[in-house]
Amino acid sequence: MVARIFKIIVIAMIALIVFVIWAGMSLFRGIDLGGTGHSTSPGIIDEYKARKIKMEKMEQLQANLEFVCKHEEKPELLPETQQLYNYALYHDLHNMWTGKRGDAVWNGLARYYRIAAMNGDYKANIRLQYLLKSGRISSDMPQTEVHNLNEELAKQLPATAYYNLYGYLDVGYGVRTEKDGKYAYLRKAADLGSREAQYVVADILGDINDEETLQMRLEIIEKLRTCASEQGLGKASNSLGIGFIIDKEYAKALEAFHQGVKNGDSQSALQLANGFNEKTRPDDKLNFINLQPDLERSYRYKIIEDYLYEKDYLQPKVPDLDDIVPLPPAPLPEWDGKIAFQRWFEGEAPPKPDEALVRRLAWQAGLNGDTG
């Protein structure tokens, strides 16, 4: 009996020892204690490799997205070509609401735009491309003429020309490229200083759904929008201002919206009209900018907002804003209720350019003096 009990105890102890050894091996199997007799768990290796690859991708992404703000340098415009441009623009804009595509007004103005553009006037070039592409000015080969104009524009404003090319590739307007090849032109345009390209790149970065790169992308987006805003793009200013409101950086929001009004953005004007309104409370997350209520400032911004909104098709700007509603604490000057663009638009038409000048410029550019 005793021998039997002893045998059971011995078997139990052996079983316990085997269990302890097995448990110990399981516990330490994934631990590298040094030397050559141990191996690292495949799971740990895979996790390390994945982390390393992700870090490398982040570094590469950051390098690819690195952005240094560049403003597009605009060459000086000749007074002679500006005579043609200003005359054409005045009548062109007055035809925008009631005119029909290919009508006598726009086709008659094409001559002045063409001659000015081919004499290096980038404003005439940009406007003429728009009028041709939209069909307002008739042409036997509009796509060919537009692309020839854009090649000429590249001599004065390469960034804008690259952005135009991106736009034409995007809609297949007479040019083709490999799939997604258009984005190379967009990035090039942004780097060279196109404000429109900078804004579009910012929007593309904002649409990426990736939490890990979010902070990095937000910083680049702000740089891009700031750069575009500084160069006169109103919607970039407004986007900046909204972002600053979300972050409760109200002083920055005020400056961004004020710049947006100068750049012709009606939404920025509305933000400031509401921001200075005494009815706007801190719980109004869309309009509160932490401003001292000022009914006259609010009223002036609202007048400007109404005009910019109603005349959006004319693309008016307000470079004279500081003479109308300077930022506080500057006092408000006298104001007749009109912005400078409005006075120009409602005023008399510029004088018709001298015919001898028109023909001389046409000859100078190798163009037909009658049609451009």
Predicted regions and their residues:
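Canonical positions in the second alpha-helix
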Residues: 73, 115-116, 150-153, 188-189, ...
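Structural signature of tandem alpha-helical TPR/SEL1-like repeats
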Residues: 101-111, 138-149, 175-185, 210-224, ...
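N-terminal leader/linker segments that initiate helical-solenoid repeat arrays
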Residues: 22-108, 119
